[in-house]
UniProtKB/Swiss-Prot annotation:
Keywords: Metal-binding, Ribonucleoprotein, Ribosomal protein, RNA-binding, rRNA-binding, Zinc. Its cofactor is Zn(2+). Part of the 50S ribosomal subunit. Binds 1 zinc ion per subunit. One of its GO terms (biological process) is translation. GO terms for cellular component: ribonucleoprotein complex; ribosome. It comes from Brevibacillus brevis (strain 47 / JCM 6285 / NBRC 100599). Belongs to the bacterial ribosomal protein bL31 family. Type A subfamily. This is Large ribosomal subunit protein bL31. PANTHER family: 50S RIBOSOMAL PROTEIN L31, CHLOROPLASTIC, LARGE RIBOSOMAL SUBUNIT PROTEIN BL31C. SUPFAM superfamilies: L28p-like (SSF143800). Binds the 23S rRNA. GO terms for molecular function: metal ion binding; rRNA binding; structural constituent of ribosome.
Length: 65
């Protein structure tokens, strides 16, 4: 196998737009993300369930059933 062909794997600080920072591993020097597990609705429990409704629901609304 060839020596020294792989990029250096660093421990980097990942910073989120919400202000949360944590360490991870990457070949980059620093990472910036827009959303993390600290502010994502799935992890915070502030999910909104959107039910678009199907064809049957539209039919019932159209004919007041």
């Amino acid at each position: 196998m060839k020596q020294d062909i792989h990029p250096k794997y660093n421990v980097v600080t990942v910073s989120c737009a919400c202000g949360n920072e944590f360490e991870s591993g990457s070949v980059k020097q620093a990472l910036k993300v827009e959303i993390c597990s600290n502010c994502h609705p799935f992890f915070t429990g502030k999910q909104k369930f959107v039910d678009a409704g199907g064809r049957v629901d539209r039919f019932k609304r159209k004919y007041n059933l």
